């Protein structure tokens, strides 16, 4: 039986007949966007709650801007990953359609979405026990992060590492199956693509 997603068996999933689905790709990417917005909204809610010197601002007004920024960020990440996967496999002699690469790239983001949801769930446990009195929003964010328990920081890093390995696995075996390329070369392209995810997220 063909699996309904490539999260656990990408080779079998992409061995099915039929064209890739841009609708599926957009849906999975949207889930990643929702995860990002949820995490940032929860993070800012707690940040506003403990920061006593923040300028008066409406959290309800900031969240829509955050959703827009996250939407642009997710779109950029998706396009970058697709470009890297497709470009490198083409240079390495692979075939396969760009449409298929878009779907494959999106499913990797699905793995990251699970990690982001997990990070959102741990945010309440990172809240400082005392109020933060800094006035600069950047300093407030630094203090907020510094107060997080070491165990939570370790869990966050491990979750990101697992999501990255999972995404590389999905991209590698999906590209090898659909683009007529060796697993080794597909893995090289996937690892390069995975490097860009935390880099882009760090910029934003």
Where are the model-predicted features located?
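N-terminal juxtamembrane cytosolic/stromal segments of multi-pass membrane proteins
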Residues: 1-50, 56-57
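Alpha-helical transmembrane segments and their helix-start/interface "positive-inside/aromatic belt" motifs
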Residues: 14-32, 99-109, 184-191
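Juxtamembrane boundary at the C-terminal end of a transmembrane helix
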Residues: 199-204
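Transmembrane helix-loop junctions in multipass membrane proteins, especially transporters and channels
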Residues: 41-53, 90-95, 124-135, 179
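Hydrophobic alpha-helical membrane-insertion segments
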Residues: 27-37, 106-123
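Membrane-interface segments at transmembrane-helix boundaries
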Residues: 4, 81-106, 172, 179
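Membrane-helix interfacial "entry" motifs
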Residues: 17, 21, 54-66, 70, ...
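Selective recognition of hydrophobic, aromatic-rich stretches within alpha-helical transmembrane segments
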Residues: 63-86, 113, 120-193
